[in-house]
Design a protein with these regions (language model features):
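Short aromatic/basic micro-patch
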Residues: 45, 95, 123
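Short, charged, intrinsically disordered terminal tails
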Residues: 146-155
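N-terminal strand-loop-strand
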Residues: 2-46
Length: 155
């Protein structure tokens, strides 16, 4: 009886795991790439967000870039995706997968956006963008995109 009770308690304490699927984009304009800042400019990252019902990752990436930056881009190629975990409170863990895409700049201005999630959006040369990115997994995505753009790998 004690074994059942102990097992039941352990099951109740285990956080619930939720899977999320997001998509994001790296927009290139000349020799610069577009990053967003969150948390009042404390964290620099790539624009991304959750897929909407029936939306493809490719379409979600274009939409999220436009919503978060005011910039429109055309998808050139897929980039490596990333996976990570984070917690929402003590009882919920999120396992997130993000598909990334390389986008060519088409139009728009990084000051023409309305987003509660983003403090600012700004263009950076490749090296500065790599130095500013907060998360190592996004630095790997940008480094991969740079190799692709500079012709070191085929699309």
């Amino acid at each position: 009886m004690a074994e059942r009770t102990t097992a039941a308690v352990k099951r109740r304490r285990r956080p619930r795991v939720v899977r999320q699927h997001s998509a994001g984009g790296l927009v290139v304009r000349g020799g610069e790439v577009l990053l967003i800042a969150t948390a009042g400019g404390a964290r620099w990252q790539l624009p991304k967000g959750r897929l909407e019902e029936g939306e493809t990752p490719r379409d979600a990436a274009v939409r999220e870039v436009r919503e978060e930056t005011g910039v429109t881009g055309n998808v050139v190629a897929p980039l490596p995706g990333i996976d990570y975990w984070f917690a929402e409170g003590a009882r919920k863990r999120i396992r997130k997968h993000v598909d990334y895409f390389l986008l060519d700049y088409v139009s728009g201005s990084e000051v023409d956006f309305d987003s509660r999630e983003v403090s600012t959006a700004r263009w950076f040369p490749w090296d500065e963008a790599l130095a500013r990115l907060t998360h190592a997994n996004e630095r790997r995505v940008v480094a991969s995109a740079r190799r692709l753009v500079e012709g070191e790998v085929a699309p």
